[in-house]
Amino acid sequence: MSCNSVLVWLTDARSVDTAQFPRFESWLSATEAARYGRFRRPLRQRQFLLGRAMLRLAMGQMLGLPPAGITLEERPGQAPLLLAPPAGPYFSIAHSGSWIACAVSSEAALGLDIEVCDPHRDVLALALQAFGAAVSDELAAMPQPARTAVFYQRWSASEAAYKLGQDAGSSVTLAHPALSIVLCSAAPLAQPPVLRVTTLASGDFL
């Protein structure tokens, strides 16, 4: 178990052994299983399952509990509610494309966002729509690939703050070659968050 108070776990769904899926499905609560069964797109279904499995593995590592001992309940339009253990850690889940991430903290409420950085998207038009002309003009003055990187960092920061749902005490950008990753917390963190990449093998969470 790490001494860091905030861990951000990241997986590429393409790297996860599908033989693990039945075990992950057995961890789902009744409300989670119902939602899981309603997904029609395989990618979205996989994002959901792996996100909940990774969250349970991460919480279990932090608390010294088996993943099956973590009970979550679905809430329409909101993050899942942690029912057991009743005094569990703060958490946030995010996904983009084949990538899924979760953050867990013993310190403060979290908001996490990840985005696949697509250099082919018209980030100037997206910035104009999302942030206004000033930001779009600022990006237009930048060379590539900095323009794309800065846009996605701003986008992730905005989404992470929205997920947090309150003023952020800190906002941290985590480096990754393919993704923009931003973690907001309700209070300043005692230590910087640590990013760990996993295939969701149980040995990764020892």
Where are these regions (language model features)?
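Core catalytic alpha/beta fold that binds nucleotide/phospho-ligands
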Residues: 1-206
